A protein has these predicted regions:
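N-terminal helix-turn-helix DNA-binding module of bacterial transcription factors
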Residues: 1-56, 324-327
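Short, solvent-exposed amphipathic alpha-helices that sit
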Residues: 32, 70-85, 161-165, 187-206, ...
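N-terminal helix-turn-helix/winged-helix DNA-binding helices
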Residues: 38-71, 75-77, 85-86, 108-111
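Structural motif
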Residues: 88-111, 162, 211-233
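Flexible loop/hinge segments that line or gate small-molecule binding clefts
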Residues: 97, 119-164, 245, 267-279
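Periplasmic-binding protein-like
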Residues: 113-121, 178-181, 212, 233-246, ...
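Hydrophobic alpha-helical segments within soluble ligand-binding/sensing domains
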Residues: 152-179, 194, 198, 202, ...
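Flexible loop/turn connectors
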Residues: 223, 227-327
Length: 327
């Protein structure tokens, strides 16, 4: 608070009164204090004590796409495991793939003076976090990088995983391999598409843009994609699904399709190994993704000021049956 008081030309006691909305502060004085808080990158928060160096609210913030998605539920569990070990609680919110909602949640968590912030980006503009970071709030991005901000980032090997999926299908005789991914503006979808194209090159196969579709996965959009990819003389004999949600909709759409194409899913999901045939997946430890990001965040909270890091976690192919179907 001393920095705010110095800039506003008032006492620390006056700053405390303004932050706590106490009466008997002249409006012009309060305006100077609030302007100083904004200039220094602070936010009005739950108490003046949070402006003091070294204070803690015992919380961290986590912004994900959708807490109802099992992928993010598992990621949240990993974050909570680490946070609990440090005596912190996790505030979690869903952006619903909306960049403005992401911004609102992140800034609301910062206004509550979380000790650190974890963000799965919904957009590519994150300059709004610069004042918070300058004010001392550590920020780590996970699953996707920030578009315009150099910051700690924890990812999985999207590129390598899809390359491996293509190689696996090619080894089983497939030459017409399709890719169905999430929306084109999503980092993981574009990276997995890039891996798909690279995998085709490595396997000596031609890229056919008609067999690569990116779209927001809904029951209707995936059913339409199946019609496009799996009918006609140039149909695909194998499909790589870009994430768990795409796979679930794809399985529903394939229920009455014959012959069934080979299928590899990027992301494992519950009961995948019990289906008929069991689903071959590019698996990775989602809980580990959350833990790795949280561990990096707490390193920053505890004073690690080394340059921003990019951590890429490995993936692995789990052959179960659907990816081994012959053309």
């Amino acid at each position: 608070m001393s920095d705010v008081a110095r800039l506003a030309g008032v006492s620390i006691k006056t700053v405390s009164r303004v932050v706590n909305d106490e009466p008997a502060v002249h409006p012009e004085t309060a305006g100077r204090v609030l302007a100083a808080i904004e200039q220094l990158g602070f936010r009005r928060n739950l108490g003046a004590r949070n402006l003091r160096r070294g204070s803690t609210t015992g919380t961290i913030g986590l912004v994900v796409e959708d807490v109802g998605n099992p992928f993010y539920s598992e990621l949240n569990r990993g974050v909570e495991q680490v946070a609990t070990s440090f005596g912190r609680h996790v505030l979690t919110g869903s952006s619903n793939e909306n960049s403005e909602r992401e911004r609102e949640l992140a800034l609301e968590f910062c206004a509550r003076r979380v000790d650190g912030l974890l963000v799965v980006p919904a957009g590519t503009q994150h300059g709004y976090l610069v004042p918070e970071m300058r004010a001392g709030t550590p920020v780590v991005f996970l699953d996707r990088p920030a578009g315009d901000l150099v910051a700690d980032t924890v990812l999985v090997d999207n590129l390598g995983g899809t390359i491996e999926a293509v190689a696996h299908l090619a080894q089983h005789g497939h030459r017409r391999i399709a890719f169905l991914g999430d929306g084109p503006g999503i980092f993981t979808a574009s990276e997995r598409l890039r891996g798909f194209r690279e995998g085709l090159v490595r396997a000596g196969l031609r890229y056919d843009e008609r067999l690569a579709l990116l779209r927001t996965p809904t029951r209707e959009s995936v059913a339409d994609a199946v019609d496009r990819l799996l009918t006609g003389p140039g149909r695909a004999t194998a499909v790589i699904a870009g994430n768990n949600r795409v796979t679930v909709h794809l399985l529903r759409a394939l229920a009455h399709v014959t012959p069934r194409p080979a299928l590899v899913s990027f992301d494992d999901f519950e009961l995948a190994d019990l289906l008929d045939p069991p689903v071959t997946v590019i698996g990775h430890d989602v809980g580990r993704l959350g833990r790795a990001a949280a561990e990096l965040l707490f390193a920053r909270i505890h004073g690690d000021d080394s340059p921003p890091r990019k951590v890429v976690l490995p993936v692995h192919l789990l052959p179960r049956g659907s990816g081994e179907v012959a053309p």
